[in-house]
Amino acid sequence: MNQPPKPNSFRSGPDEEGRFGIFGGRFVAETLMPLILDLQDEWARAKNDPAFKAELENLGRHYIGRPSPLYFAERLTAELGGAKIYFKREELNHTGSHKINNCIGQILLAKRMGKTRIIAETGAGQHGVASATVAARFGLPCVVYMGATDVERQAPNVFRMKLLGAEVKPVTAGHGTLKDAMNEALRDWVTNVDSTYYLIGTAAGPHPYPEMVRDFQAVIGEEAKQQMLEAEGRLPDLVVAAVGGGSNAIGIFHPFLDDGGVRIVGVEAGGKGLDGDEHCASLTAGSPGVLHGNRTYLLQDGDGQIKEGHSISAGLDYPGIGPEHAWLNDIGRVEYVPIMDHEALEAFQILTRLEGIIPALEPSHALAEVIKRAPKMGKDEIILMNLSGRGDKDIFTVGKILGMGQ
């Protein structure tokens, strides 16, 4: 789990109220507050419990398959003709993405708290699959809320969840995407507080979720840091990751925040362009507000109503962002940029053909930014990118767009 920060660190948040500057906090229904406080207390005990850490590490090694490899993308580097490009291969984890890191940690907490039922929300389906997987592993029933639009575009993951024994509940409200699924999951939680643990998949939601998810995902950056020192004898010049709610990104960013020589870039879903509403670039084009229990940057209209947003990638299709990212953006430690659907699609194809790796559409956004930046950097410079998920789930979406369907 995450290493303790130094004084005057970018890594010391959140405060006792769960705030990162003006962001974060706990904005929940009165009925949920006792549960949130119980979770906070249990988390405080667990993270200082050697037995909890040992079990987490054991499952990480033998069930998830950690450490994930650090891979030098030799052909991509040669093709772009600039900085050396390394991938942190989170898509090689059990279930095919970074999501399992957090799910294993949280299911251990749920067991400690005596909960007998798991609920989760999912967009791309990767968190749903990871939640259903750990629920099966620990013998707990699992209900996954998923927007009806996402159920349609992520059919392979829906089937996986059902095979794993989870009940998948399509949500037709709104645009039927991740925001709507999260709303339904919160409604379920309010009515089943005694038995149910809500396994949130991203670094958002009410405190302690953003901190907890970050700490479970920080294994990505901790490993990558060590692996980079072994491979190159130094840290990278640039770290890049895709940002939806922001869990894979904060996982790789956080261990590097206090390393001043490392530039950090988060890549948002620019969708069809920032001039309309067909994007999910909360930091680039949003404004502060409250959603799903925390204050952060949101896509909202003048009346504070949440916009639906759009991305080719179901996992980035969220009109908000984790509060720690909002804070890192405002203090200028991390730069956040948008990438359009067509750029991500092109990057998806480039990686597939040059390296024989089919990436998910989420990290394809990060890759598109790497493809832009690498040629402008020196050959002695190094880029580290989080390859957060594999693209099996996206092949039908991509095939349809490229006219390569059956």
UniProtKB/Swiss-Prot annotation:
GO terms of molecular function: tryptophan synthase activity
Cofactor(s) required, per the database record: pyridoxal 5'-phosphate
Modified residues (N6-(pyridoxal phosphate)lysine): K99
Domain of life: Bacteria
Gene Ontology terms: cellular component: cytoplasm
Keywords from the named record: Amino-acid biosynthesis, Aromatic amino acid biosynthesis, Lyase, Pyridoxal phosphate, Tryptophan biosynthesis
Transmembrane feature ranges: none
EC number: 4.2.1.20
InterPro entries (UniProt xref): Trp_synth_b_CS, Trp_synth_beta, Trp_synth_beta/beta-like, TrpB-like_PALP, TrpB-like_PALP_sf
Catalytic activity: (1S,2R)-1-C-(indol-3-yl)glycerol 3-phosphate + L-serine = D-glyceraldehyde 3-phosphate + L-tryptophan + H2O
Recorded metabolic or biological pathway in which this protein acts: Amino-acid biosynthesis; L-tryptophan biosynthesis; L-tryptophan from chorismate: step 5/5
Subunit structure: Tetramer of two alpha and two beta chains.
Biological role stated in the UniProt entry: The beta subunit is responsible for the synthesis of L-tryptophan from indole and L-serine.
Recorded family membership: Belongs to the TrpB family.
Protein name as annotated: Tryptophan synthase beta chain
Organism placement in taxonomy: Bacteria, Pseudomonadati, Pseudomonadota, Alphaproteobacteria, Hyphomicrobiales
